[in-house]
Structure formats: structure tokens, C-alpha cells
């Protein structure tokens, strides 16, 4: 089977849904729960879930420091929802001891659109995604409050950035894995290929 080997952090979240979208986008998805598995991938997806819980699990599974090192070394990573939070340099509304991987020069606000009952769907024009607007599912979603000069905003809801890219890092505040549309995953897989990481 050809295509880059893309890991999915399999501690919490929509692992199967991401795997399905990655397969459709031409990648070979694999579950990542340990550092030895992380070392074998060309790129990584950080799925949604509860960001503080995922952060604690990263410590339990001894993945936090290997992930930070991999991101610093240029591993392409795509974070959706909680994954966006984990890739941020700082979080508004988070716990002061919340572990972050970092890498994206952004400050995000947790639950920016409200609680679970305030979850919603929208159609977004996403830079780099051809075709009709992307159907985006927002579930207790963050948004980007501040972004550094190196961060490219790819999509917004009202004025709030909800999709950003910085070098090999991509993040969405929404869950593209839930809609059956693999175009955002394809954007990431293509970036892995173009980075030279894809085997």
C-alpha cells in the first residue's frame, strides 16, 4: 500500500473516523500510543476529545516530551479541536497546569463558542481546499484569539480564525473527520508528501 504513513494519537477521540478520512486521502493510517510508534510515522493527527484529559494521558503514556521533540524536529502534525489546543503555545480558559505540545504560534480559547449545547455546523471556505465549502462540525470548539506573523489563517467563523497553518502544522477548531469529506485530510496528506516525509 502506497502513501505516507500517518499516525493517529489513539488515546481519546475519533480515531476510526480519522483513519477512514486518511485512507480516503491516500495515506496509511496507524494508531500511535507509544513513543516507538511515533518514531515510525511520516505525520501525525491529534484528534479531538477533552484537551486536559489528553494532556494527562500524554504524560501517563510518556508521549508528551517525544511529541514536543518530534514537532520541534519538523514532524507534520494536524490537530482537530482539542488537537488545535494541544498545538497552541497558550490557552485561554484552560487549566494552568494543562500540558501542551506547542509548535503553533497561537493562543486559543477553549470552548470559545460555548458548551456542548452550543455546538453547531457551518460551511467554510478553507484556503487550499478546492470545491464547495467545507461542512464543518463544531463541538465545544476553540478559536484562535491571537496568531503570530508566521501563522496563516485558512478559515474563519465571523472574525474568529478556526483553521490555521504554520509550516508543517495544520489545525482546525472543527471536526472534519465527522462529515465524510476527506478534503481537509487530503490537504494535510499532501503537505506531508510535499515535505518529503512521505515514504
UniProtKB/Swiss-Prot annotation:
Alphabetical list of Pfam families matching this protein: SNO
Cysteines engaged in disulfide bonds, as pairs: none
Q: Which PROSITE patterns match?
A: PDXT_SNO_1, PDXT_SNO_2
Q: What is its EC number?
A: 4.3.3.6, 3.5.1.2
Domain of life, per UniProt, equals Bacteria
Residues bound to L-glutamine are 49-51, 110, 139-140
An example GO CC term for this entry is: glutaminase complex
Task: Tell me what reaction this enzyme catalyses.
Answer: aldehydo-D-ribose 5-phosphate + D-glyceraldehyde 3-phosphate + L-glutamine = pyridoxal 5'-phosphate + L-glutamate + phosphate + 3 H2O + H(+); L-glutamine + H2O = L-glutamate + NH4(+)
Q: Which SUPFAM superfamilies match?
A: Class I glutamine amidotransferase-like
GO molecular function annotation: glutaminase activity; pyridoxal 5'-phosphate synthase (glutamine hydrolysing) activity
Active-site residues (renumbered): 81, 175, 177
Q: Which UniProt keywords apply?
A: Glutamine amidotransferase, Hydrolase, Lyase, Pyridoxal phosphate
According to UniProt, this protein's pathway is:
Cofactor biosynthesis; pyridoxal 5'-phosphate biosynthesis
Per the UniProt entry, what is one GO biological process? pyridoxine metabolic process
Q: Which InterPro entries match?
A: Class_I_gatase-like (IPR029062), PdxT/SNO (IPR002161), PdxT/SNO_CS (IPR021196)
Q: How does it assemble?
A: In the presence of PdxS, forms a dodecamer of heterodimers. Only shows activity in the heterodimer.
Q: What does this protein do?
A: Catalyzes the hydrolysis of glutamine to glutamate and ammonia as part of the biosynthesis of pyridoxal 5'-phosphate. The resulting ammonia molecule is channeled to the active site of PdxS.
Family membership: Belongs to the glutaminase PdxT/SNO family.
Q: Which NCBIfam families match?
A: PLP_synth_Pdx2
- The name on file for this protein is Pyridoxal 5'-phosphate synthase subunit PdxT
The record lists the organism as Frankia casuarinae (strain DSM 45818 / CECT 9043 / HFP020203 / CcI3)
Q: What is the lineage of its organism?
A: Bacteria, Bacillati, Actinomycetota, Actinomycetes, Frankiales
